[in-house]
Amino acid sequence: MKKAQTWIITCFCLQLLLLNPLVKTQSSCGNPVTDDVNDIAKLVGNLPNDYLITLKYVPKMDSLPNHCWLHLMVPEFSRSLHNLLQKFVDISDMSDVLSNYSIINNLTRIINDLMACLAFDKNKDFIKENGHLYEEDRFIPENFFRLFNRTIEVYKEFADSLDKNDCIMPSTVETPENDSRVAVTKTISFPPVAASSLRNDSIGSNTSSNSNKEALGFISSSSLQGISIALTSLLSLLIGFILGVIYWKKTHPKSRPESNETTQCHGCQEENEISMLQQKEKEHLQV
């Protein structure tokens, strides 16, 4: 019986060890912002000044908290960066393409990791309900990556409290101001770098839809990983429980034959005593 209890306790401890990585992935995601953001200046210098990048954005409003603005902007940056990355596939001049591709790929990874830290599934209803706040525009690289840097700054500001703050819009939401785009188009200084021959043609609808699927697919990758860990843990617990029950059933019935043998031995002693008494009585009668 003690061995069966020890086996069940061991399986329970293994279950806790398997669930530990799941708790860690849900409670902490580390720092998704790496030093690769320092290469943005080089990338902006490599892209033509008149190149336009499409982005759906939400203008800053007093009634929209910064951490909620972050939830609205990050998925759109992920889509735009995926589209930008795909456009380098069709470029024949490979002089600066590899460098630019590497930088954009690193920035895409950062924004995707950041999106995983934001618990996108938790606030997707908030994003759907406030889709009317989006405006679509085409930005030159300088202004596009200024917005990108602003998004990174907001994340750093609220990184420790994002899990605690839910996005709830007030009953009355102000409309985006007309001069909001003016704030976006302020110039910033980047070091001049030779511009590459990146073409400004748009990708076909199939390529665009594929990149959107990739962006959306990453959103659910973290949740799928958590589900797989949870299922593995539950399966191990079930197997451990079944093995414990089988072991207990095999060891427990062994105690019954022992008790039967003991009972039989007691019966034999009583019979022997009775037979001895009977013999003594016979001898006494004979005498």
UniProtKB/Swiss-Prot annotation:
Regions of this protein lying in the Extracellular compartment:
26-225
Any single Gene Ontology cellular-component annotation: filopodium
Sorted alphabetically, which keywords does the UniProt record give? Cell adhesion, Cell membrane, Cell projection, Cytoplasm, Cytoskeleton, Disulfide bond, Glycoprotein, Growth factor, Membrane, Secreted, Signal, Transmembrane, Transmembrane helix
Superkingdom of the organism of origin: Eukaryota
Q: Does the keyword Transmembrane apply?
A: yes
Signal peptide range equals: 1-25
Where in the chain are disulfide-linked cysteines found? 29-117, 68-167
GO biological process terms, alphabetically, are:
cell adhesion; positive regulation of cell population proliferation
Oligomeric and partner information: Homodimer, non-covalently linked.
Q: Which Gene3D superfamilies match?
A: 1.20.1250.10
Q: What does this protein do?
A: Ligand for the receptor-type protein-tyrosine kinase KIT. Plays an essential role in the regulation of cell survival and proliferation, hematopoiesis, stem cell maintenance, gametogenesis, mast cell development, migration and function, and in melanogenesis. KITLG/SCF binding can activate several signaling pathways. Acts synergistically with other cytokines, probably interleukins.
Transmembrane segment boundaries: 226-246
Annotated Gene Ontology MF terms?
cytokine activity; growth factor activity; stem cell factor receptor binding
Record topology, Cytoplasmic segments: 247-287
Q: What is this protein called?
A: Kit ligand
Residues linked to a glycan: 100, 106, 149, 178, 200, 206
Q: So what family is this one in? A: Belongs to the SCF family.
Give the record's PTM text: A soluble form is produced by proteolytic processing of isoform 1 in the extracellular domain.
